[in-house]
From Swiss-Prot:
Family that this chain belongs to: Belongs to the class-II aminoacyl-tRNA synthetase family. Phe-tRNA synthetase alpha subunit type 1 subfamily.
Taxonomic source organism: Delftia acidovorans (strain DSM 14801 / SPH-1)
Subunit architecture: Tetramer of two alpha and two beta subunits.
UniProt-listed Enzyme Commission number(s): 6.1.1.20
Entry's Gene Ontology cellular component terms: cytoplasm
Source organism superkingdom: Bacteria
Descriptive protein name: Phenylalanine--tRNA ligase alpha subunit
Binding note for cofactor: Binds 2 magnesium ions per tetramer.
PROSITE patterns noted in UniProt: AA_TRNA_LIGASE_II
Length: 350
């Protein structure tokens, strides 16, 4: 083994002994640094002849390449060892139980709304949607509510910016405006047929959604839900209202022995009008009459505001509170519990 082979072997051994990158750099300096052994060998060629320089320089370069290869290999080995140590320090114990992820669910009122839509959908009713910021015309005027009606007072209605003094904007106080909007669009769609005396398909729609009134106690909230229904055609009677709503209540409460009664009442948008009460024959509420909805035959002025002839088209409307239906179905006495955001309470209804 000549001098250069011994030099390469010596470098390999020294590099292998280095335990850290810093140790390796110190070992490198002994061979490849400014005063390293390879550098000294290169300097020693100054006294050689041209031919000797060629052969000696080539041999030194081969040795230098061997040293650099050993240096690169050791650098990689140290980097791999450092990575493995780092990964080992951060290893996860997969046998530990994971953190429990809470499972969400629909709000009980949302469940009620879905149930209402499903029942009326099976009877052929569409579902209407509309803006919660409504115009005075759709909310009151179109529904035959006179200008001096108490409901128009700021004590009962939230008025908002926008609109005009003659037609202010407000947070809708019921979902009836959605019925009018739906009916107006329906009539517009079939206007040519109506003008030709060919008639139109019946208007059969429910309008569920949020409504707002200045009211707050155990059974009332400033924001509450309503679902109103409308059926207009050429031969729709109060009898149809009784059949439809009776079927709905029995299906919703899953009770065939449920009893309904219609009490005479007054609403500006229906004539005649009736409050609807139900009576359970069994359970904790058995024997009590519970008010669940208002209803009546659609007033001729409202039919006229929909763009129809009240002499030819007639129908019924009803309005109920999904919040109250939810209270009755689950036996909850305080409406505010549904909107306090208490997960412990709401999770019972999943």
């Amino acid at each position: 083994m000549n001098e250069l082979d011994s030099l390469v072997e010596s470098a390999q051994q020294l590099f292998a002994q280095a335990q850290t990158p810093a140790d390796l750099e110190n070992a490198k300096a002994q061979f490849l640094g400014k005063s390293g052994k390879v550098t000294e060998l290169m300097k020693g060629m100054a006294q050689l002849s041209v031919e000797e320089k060629k052969s000696r320089g080539a041999a030194i370069n081969v040795a230098k390449q061997g040293i650099e290869a050993a240096l690169t290999a050791r650098r990689k080995a140290l980097a791999d060892a450092e990575l493995q140590a780092h990964l080992k320090a951060e290893v996860l114990d997969v046998t530990l139980p994971g953190r429990r992820r809470g499972q969400g669910g629909l709000h009980p009122v949302s469940l009620t709304l879905e149930r209402i839509e499903g029942i009326f959908g099976s009877m052929g009713f569409d579902v209407a949607e509309g803006p919660e910021i409504e115009s005075d015309w759709f909310n009151f005027t179109a529904l035959n509510t006179p200008e001096d009606h108490p409901a128009r007072s700021m004590h009962d209605t939230f008025y908002v910016e926008g609109g005009t003094e003659q037609a202010p904007n407000l947070l809708r106080t019921h979902t009836s405006p959605m019925q009018v909007r739906h009916a107006v669009q329906h009539v517009k769609k079939y206007r040519e047929r109506l003008d030709a005396g060919q008639g139109m398909p019946e208007i059969r729609v429910i309008a569920p959604g949020r409504t707002y009134r200045v009211d707050s106690d155990a059974t009332h909230s400033p924001m509450f839900h309503q679902c109103e229904g409308l059926w207009i055609g050429e031969n729709v009677s109060f009898k149809d209202l009784k059949v439809v709503f009776t079927d709905f209540c029995k299906t919703f409460f899953e009770s065939d022995d449920l009893v309904l009664r219609f009490r005479p009442s007054f609403f500006p948008f229906t004539e005649p009008s009736a409050e609807i009460d139900i009576q359970f024959q069994s359970g904790p509420l058995a024997g009590r009459w519970l008010e669940v909805a208002g209803s009546g035959q659609v007033h001729p002025n409202v039919v006229r505001n929909m763009g129809l002839d009240p002499e030819k088209y007639i129908g019924f409307a009803f309005g109920m509170g999904p919040d109250r239906l939810t209270m009755l179905r689950y036996g909850v006495n305080d409406l505010r519990l549904f909107f306090d955001g208490d997960i412990r309470f709401l999770s019972q209804f999943r």
